A protein has these predicted regions:
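Hydrophobic "lid"/C-terminal helical patch
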Residues: 166-173
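Short clusters of hydrophobic/aromatic residues that line enzyme substrate/ligand-binding pockets
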Residues: 23, 35, 143, 153-156
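C-terminal boundary of histidine-terminating zinc-finger modules
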Residues: 146-165
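Cytosolic-facing regulatory segments adjacent to core modules
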Residues: 1-57
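Active-site/binding-pocket entry motifs
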Residues: 15-16, 139-143
């Protein structure tokens, strides 16, 4: 339960590490499809399920990738973003037998209007072969302050540029889901 109606959140904290360990220890069950099976049981209660996870390919992340339809891959310009995106694509390819419909869509984050950022964004759009959100998420100190304060961005700064950017991304995503 949260302060927001119709939204439930399972935080990515130490509980997930324990869940990963428990999944590994339960060798008699099919560990990699546990989340997909659990989500099927509650599918009437939710329109969407968003799982925030790190890049470490542990059992929890594998479960998420197998249950997912779409991976939104944040890309922050910093030197390793292209390699990280390619690694993610390879990891997803390894899971195609179990989840053949899983897609990746890149989301440019922490975007600045400098030459490097614009070059990476252009490469992603034109040469990378990755599907990409039209709206980039601009860099703003407000987003960092919101994270530090542990307050959701729209509550911390309702009219800020980053809140507006994320709303645009959500609208893009909802429009895509309707098609």
């Amino acid at each position: 339960p949260t302060d927001y109606s119709h939204i439930d959140i399972i935080p990515a904290n130490g509980y997930l590490m324990k869940t990963d360990m428990n999944l590994l220890l339960k060798s008699e069950d099919n560990q990699v499809t546990r989340l997909r099976e659990a989500l099927e049981e509650v599918s009437d209660a939710y329109d969407y399920c968003i799982c925030d996870c790190g890049r470490l390919l542990d059992m929890v992340v594998i479960n998420i990738l197998i249950a997912a339809e779409l991976v939104i891959a944040p890309v922050k310009v910093g030197g390793y973003e292209i390699e990280a995106l390619q690694n993610l694509e390879e990891q997803i390819e390894d899971l195609r037998d179990i989840n053949p419909d899983l897609r990746i869509k890149a989301l440019m984050t922490m975007r600045q209007k400098n030459k490097t950022s614009l070059e990476v964004e252009e490469w992603l759009k034109t040469e990378s072969g990755f599907d990409m959100f039209v709206t980039p998420i601009r860099r703003s100190i407000i987003a960092e302050k919101s994270t530090t304060a542990m307050i959701p961005l729209p509550k911390f700064s309702k009219r800020g540029i980053v809140s507006q950017d994320y709303r645009c991304v959500v609208h893009e995503l909802l429009k895509e889901m309707e098609e």
